[in-house]
Amino acid sequence: MTYIEILGQNAKKASQSVARLSTASKNEILRDLARNIVADTETILTENARDVVKAKDNGISEIMVDRLRLNKDRIQAIANGIYQVADLADPIGQVVSGYTNLDGLKILKKRVPLGVIAMIFESRPNVSVDAFSLAFKTGNAIILRGGKDAIFSNTALVNCMRQTLQDTGHNPDIVQLVEDTSHVVAEELMQATDYVDVLIPRGGAKLIQTVKEKSKIPVIETGVGNVHIYIDEFADLDMAAKIVINAKTQRPSVCNAAEGLVVHQAIAKGFLSQLEKMLKESNQSVEFRADEEALQLLENAVAASESDYATEFLDYIMSVKVVDSFEQAISWINKYSSHHSEAIITNNISRAEIFQDMVDAAAVYVNASTRFTDGFVFGLGAEIGISTQKLHARGPMGLEALTSTKYYINGTGQVRE
């Protein structure tokens, strides 16, 4: 058997046991894990430091290194996230609908686990813990394949998960880490249809596209955030500038950070001037990659290429497009959007409603930063990712997104005539 076949077989077996765990047992184990992760802080930080040194040696940008880096506060935040998942209502066994049909059959539609989840993700090591917590709470086994940049951190965290399961008398193979980070093994995981029920990629555009093209397992597409903010001619310009600065600069390396700015021509001069003024006042610097009209109005700008409009920069860089009309803004955003999060800043209620209806994205904002697209903020607890597709799940994926449904039919001897 191949390495992936062994992992898959182990996961399939473990999925049978975790599916039967009571809510109380799952919550107790999750709380044990949270305590154990905090207790293992020094070990985890030591391993994380190895990843950080390696990343710097490989010339990875400081913004991307920040995604990788852990500290005591971030480890405590990881533990707090586990506690929050433990406190959430368990969807497994929840009755979605129930009725008695004309034949006297009692039909219940219940939430059940998906089975075995595989996740391929990039640098952030906290993803491994979030993914396990949600998968475990919903009675699923999970196979984690993180990026090579975080292999030491992920190994330390998964070892803690497996030890917690073993110490509580449960199968540690409920969670497994693919320790071989080669592309060959990743592609083998994408073909493991006999063992894996769903594959969730979380990372950049290249990773997502590779998984979509090569996976034979059903895929839930997540992550890529080519996010836009449209400044309408009826916008409060001061509020608009504050929102853009927050959405771009608070944490530019995350998928809900704004990447594209679309501005109505009627207020472009005043707004862009206000934006640059407020950036200077807040000691922030953003490189604007602008179209011809915006280029004449901005101080810190270079001419945009066509590819810039479709790029998730994950940096202090932002594309700028000036449009002649509200309708052109919607058309532009729908052309370049990755269907993650989009926003309009306007005091025109009719335009706000039309924008929310017509823009094709999982989350559409009016007069607010796109940085709020997050499982915790939406009240879902931790998230396994933000789905940018329409089938099965869309937007931040919490517990319910990791379940399926099953019909339970009870009769008293009925046969079909």
From Swiss-Prot:
<dbReference type="InterPro" id="IPR015590">
    <property type="entry name" value="Aldehyde_DH_dom"/>
</dbReference>
<comment type="function">
    <text>Catalyzes the NADPH-dependent reduction of L-glutamate 5-phosphate into L-glutamate 5-semialdehyde and phosphate. The product spontaneously undergoes cyclization to form 1-pyrroline-5-carboxylate.</text>
</comment>
<dbReference type="InterPro" id="IPR016163">
    <property type="entry name" value="Ald_DH_C"/>
</dbReference>
<dbReference type="GO" id="GO:0004350">
    <property type="term" value="F:glutamate-5-semialdehyde dehydrogenase activity"/>
</dbReference>
<dbReference type="InterPro" id="IPR012134">
    <property type="entry name" value="Glu-5-SA_DH"/>
</dbReference>
<keyword id="KW-0521">NADP</keyword>
<dbReference type="GO" id="GO:0005737">
    <property type="term" value="C:cytoplasm"/>
</dbReference>
<keyword id="KW-0963">Cytoplasm</keyword>
<comment type="pathway">
    <text>Amino-acid biosynthesis; L-proline biosynthesis; L-glutamate 5-semialdehyde from L-glutamate: step 2/2.</text>
</comment>
<keyword id="KW-0028">Amino-acid biosynthesis</keyword>
<dbReference type="GO" id="GO:0050661">
    <property type="term" value="F:NADP binding"/>
</dbReference>
<protein>
    <recommendedName>
        <fullName>Gamma-glutamyl phosphate reductase</fullName>
        <ecNumber>1.2.1.41</ecNumber>
    </recommendedName>
</protein>
<dbReference type="InterPro" id="IPR016161">
    <property type="entry name" value="Ald_DH/histidinol_DH"/>
</dbReference>
<comment type="similarity">
    <text>Belongs to the gamma-glutamyl phosphate reductase family.</text>
</comment>
<keyword id="KW-0641">Proline biosynthesis</keyword>
<dbReference type="InterPro" id="IPR000965">
    <property type="entry name" value="GPR_dom"/>
</dbReference>
<dbReference type="GO" id="GO:0055129">
    <property type="term" value="P:L-proline biosynthetic process"/>
</dbReference>
<keyword id="KW-0560">Oxidoreductase</keyword>
<dbReference type="InterPro" id="IPR020593">
    <property type="entry name" value="G-glutamylP_reductase_CS"/>
</dbReference>
<dbReference type="Pfam" id="PF00171">
    <property type="entry name" value="Aldedh"/>
</dbReference>
<dbReference type="InterPro" id="IPR016162">
    <property type="entry name" value="Ald_DH_N"/>
</dbReference>
